[in-house]
Amino acid sequence: MAGEITETGELYSSYVGLVYMFNLIVGTGALTMPKAFATAGWLVSLVLLVFLGFMSFVTTTFVIEAMAAANAQLHWKRMENLKEEEDDDSSTASDSDVLIRDNYERAEKRPILSVQRRGSPNPFEITDRVEMGQMASMFFNKVGVNLFYFCIIVYLYGDLAIYAAAVPFSLMQVTCSATGNDSCGVEADTKYNDTDRCWGPLRRVDAYRIYLAIFTLLLGPFTFFDVQKTKYLQILTSLMRWIAFAVMIVLALIRIGHGQGEGHPPLADFSGVRNLFGVCVYSFMCQHSLPSLITPVSSKRHLTRLVFLDYVLILAFYGLLSFTAIFCFRGDSLMDMYTLNFARCDVVGLAAVRFFLGLFPVFTISTNFPIIAVTLRNNWKTLFHREGGTYPWVVDRVVFPTITLVPPVLVAFCTHDLESLVGITGAYAGTGIQYVIPAFLVYHCRRDTQLAFGCGVSNKHRSPFRHTFWVGFVLLWAFSCFIFVTANIILSETKL
């Protein structure tokens, strides 16, 4: 849940943390990136991908700095509580006690740094896992906290809508193609409409909605309970994902090497930038989960370098996946879910591989859906929670899970346009989480740290982008993106 301080958990090395972060960032968004690349043109896509990767790295360092500042505040509060307990346990005050207390009160008025003793641990060590919601409560006012939760909730709703649409869409594409006249999947020149027949009198859209209903009935009830992803399930889903990505890249390279590449992507097509922007922002999203990833890292000496290395590797992977895709397949034949392009017999001869690639999103996304749903439900609870209050059983166990589950399922019922869903989620809620919230967090944490610790203090995890210019630049970029995407949507709608 976004609003709690939780246990650090089992520690792991910095390189294991690097792998975890890689797995977190490279998710569903990567499967929608090839089509977005083909639509916007390869040069525009490459430039935007690199720039958005850099901006995500900047705000990631902002969040790490805010985590360190939050830990410093918690460290000092524990010291204060310890001193208060010692004062309560002391006997009746003597003259010397009065003198000591007077000295302590004077010390309270001085910056925290001047009170610390040599040999004490660095207060900026990231030892407590302080989630983003708790950091918002520490550094923002009430309005800021509510806006933070609103942004998180909108993003999680978008996430659930994408997942709720992706699974039935994949099942529809694989099963309708396999049971129709084309037993080998989606052919390159075949254009299916939702009104085309799937099984007998059932249309493709009917099959999609049947799968959506089954998906909701099977996974929806988990929203009403607490569920967490086990380590072994995480290992299994990660293994499946990397096998699938590796197979797709190798198959695309083989086709290109044999001269069978069909793609001739344009250099630039600015009409596709809107969706590309949203997809790229969504594909670099990790800021909301950084406390869970960074805190258990045992050695944080070179944390910024490792994070930078992670981003370089992710950029290289996204580039390899997308460029092999757009030169292997024609732009108009690329599917919203890239895995579905490998349901063709002329691309993959083995039926087992075709079905594995076509259906692998079904398993991996299905295991994530309950986790995100429970996270969203808990954020709703935190948003309306009042100190010392409890929710009635009906509100806690029925109302919150229902308002969590119903909206994304309704969105998925109305559309299965995954590229647009990812684009809109990334462009709006993603911009808030990836740019706006980290920028305001680091600005307020720096101000609070200076007031509490004095001007001479140094946050050991301070971002290399420490000048206030970078905070302003990130906010200006976020505002520009919001205006651009909104204007693009309005112009696109007026043309229809």
Curated annotation (Swiss-Prot):
A GO CC term attached to the entry: membrane
Keyword 4Fe-4S part of the UniProt annotation: no
Regions that span the bilayer: 11-31, 37-57, 147-167, 205-225, 234-254, 277-297, 307-327, 355-375, 398-418, 422-442, 471-491
Main location: membrane
Membrane topology (Extracellular): 32-36, 168-204, 255-276, 328-354, 419-421, 492-496
Protein's membrane topology: Multi-pass membrane protein
Superkingdom in the source lineage: Eukaryota
Compartmental location: Membrane
Glycosylation sites: N193
Cytoplasmic side: 1-10, 58-146, 226-233, 298-306, 376-397, 443-470
UniProt keyword list: Glycoprotein, Membrane, Transmembrane, Transmembrane helix
PANTHER family associated with the record: TRANSMEMBRANE PROTEIN 104, TRANSMEMBRANE PROTEIN 104-RELATED
UniProt record similarity statement: Belongs to the TMEM104 family.
Name of the molecule in the record: Transmembrane protein 104
Organism the protein comes from: Homo sapiens
